[in-house]
Amino acid sequence: MDMESWKLLRSVCVLSFLLGSCFVYQSLRVVDAQEDPKPAVTLQVDASNGGGRPIPETLFGIFFEEINHAGAGGLWAELVSNRGFEAGGQNTPSNIWPWSIVGDHSSIYVATDRSSCFERNKIALRMDVLCDSKGCPSGGVGVYNPGYWGMNIEEGKKYKVALYVRSTGDIDLSVSLTSSNGSRTLASEKIIASASDVSKWIKKEVLLEAKATDPSARLQLTTTKKGSIWIDQVSAMPVDTHKGHGFRNDLFQMMADIKPRFIRFPGGCFVEGEWLSNAFRWKETVGPWEERPGHFGDVWKYWTDDGLGHFEFFQMAEDIGAAPIWVFNNGISHNDEVETASIMPFVQEALDGIEFARGDANSTWGSVRAKMGRQEPFELKYVAIGNEDCGKTYYRGNYIVFYDAIKKAYPDIKIISNCDGSSHPLDHPADYYDYHIYTSASNLFSMYHQFDRTSRKGPKAFVSEYAVTGKDAGTGSLLASLAEAAFLIGLEKNSDIVEMASYAPLFVNTNDRRWNPDAIVFNSSHLYGTPSYWVQRFFAESSGATLLTSTLKGNSTSLVASAISWKNNGKDYIRIKAVNFGANSENMQVLVTGLDPNVMRVSGSKKTVLTSTNVMDENSFSQPEKVVPHESLLELAEEDMTVVLPPHSFSSFDLLKESAKIRMPISDSSSHQKTTTV
């Protein structure tokens, strides 16, 4: 074969190879296209300037109720339980639980009596030490308090212990933080005083610095000096509470990360009580902590010293940047009611409570606030008259008396009725009506449309309590959270009538689970968020954003989706949120119209997905991040894109927009025209 023939043959072979490769490549592309089915649904989003409406600034917030030891033994950082010995009742001698003795009955005798110097809490503890330095155990005898299922003491941290004491003789009292059985001392200081110094009640304080860590520690008060000592109002607080305001840092931060726009407090059924004698009464929760009598919350069956009181709730709201919504008792409990003709003392109590928050420092109740260290008024624009009381005999009559009195004194305050106005108009005036829903996952998912047909006239809706409960919920399942996410998307779409919404309950101490499920789970030293908590985080940017007009087209009955636009650090985003409630993966086309071409940026766009391998998966102390959102780069951020929604998932897609680049002519001294990009 000559050289020319060889070159020709080689060229033919190369050409054949290239043609064959192209054919194979095209065939593979066809196969890929066939294996990647067309999207089952399309979300059409109108992002033009006129394509949306504002979402209320207040839409998503939180509801704090004293339930599950959410406050006492939780958010409120006080380590001592039953610090004033009042929990056992006013008849003495009384039960001092959870206090107990160090030593035995041959060396120490303790009992309560009514000798306290505080008029509202007369119970004190008398400790008769029967041994002396020779006969007492080396560590002394006395009493200890284990706190709320153990005190979390951390090495290097400081704890302020305060107590009131008196005695008939000299005292030499050791104040110690120890391990749960008292065998190891974590920190200790002495209070030494002469008989003349402690012949009358006197406040003593010590600062303890822990030299070791123990999440199940206890506080001990011990002595080897024979004689009688009276003790009252014992407090142990970490020095490093949030802003020094008494809130446990890690729990406060979990709450703050939701970015709530309001906080409803202090209940709930906690406000009502099983009986009015045990209802939360705000006046008993203000002033110096040692003067607060505390009370037994008979609905949730535990004692609170009320260190977390009326003042602290307003402080919490301010610290978290949320509008306070105060729920007060309207003369009605679960089992007894005050008739309307006799309701005025309760009305005056509500007016006084508003004055405490908003009044001038020279006003009657504003001055009480000022004495607590707060000269400036708190902000208070919302109050709720009762909780879940609409069907009670005297509610409507009582409500009108409260409404008229509050509007006369504070016409700007927005008033929330307990009666549901979503299906029928209210028969009384209100700015908002309260709506509560606890149900199964499938029911709540279907309630995505709950407010679609609600009249836009009259009061706005406040969905102040909602959650999936029952077997679908477990103790905080993925399934429950997905139904809640769909429900919230529905509230977001109906935010022209729904102005506020909050999940319930917020906190649970695992040692006293009175309600199930809850958003944030904790014990003395650890915490985690349930999937329902993480759903709340998806909606943090919705309040005050713009709801974009969107339409979901397709055959799927398991998908719910919406779109908002919002700003962060001066940048514009479109956020697509989608719930796939079904067991199969779904492809969803997202078609955004009304934007300039090529406005989306891949860099800065992201997707966030909440899902797991099993729809009933939960988080736990051993696996706190088993079901949490996972964030990644959104590589195909375009006006027309297809996204994959995993089975049983909640996804958000944040599309970063940038200003369109326009070519503008400019001129210089030359005769040629130049362009610049702006």
UniProtKB/Swiss-Prot annotation:
EC number: 3.2.1.55, 3.2.1.-
Temperature-related properties: Optimum temperature is 67 degrees Celsius.
Coiled-coil portions: none
pH-activity dependence text: Optimum pH is 4.3.
UniProt GO BP: L-arabinose metabolic process; xylan catabolic process
Location in the cell: Secreted, Extracellular space, Extracellular matrix
Catalytic activity: Hydrolysis of terminal non-reducing alpha-L-arabinofuranoside residues in alpha-L-arabinosides
Extent of the signal sequence: 1-33
Biological function: May be involved in the coordinated dissolution of the cell wall matrix during abscission and in the secondary cell wall formation in xylem vessels. Prefers arabinoxylan, but may also use pectic arabinans as substrates.
Name by which UniProt lists this protein: Alpha-L-arabinofuranosidase 1
Gene: ASD1
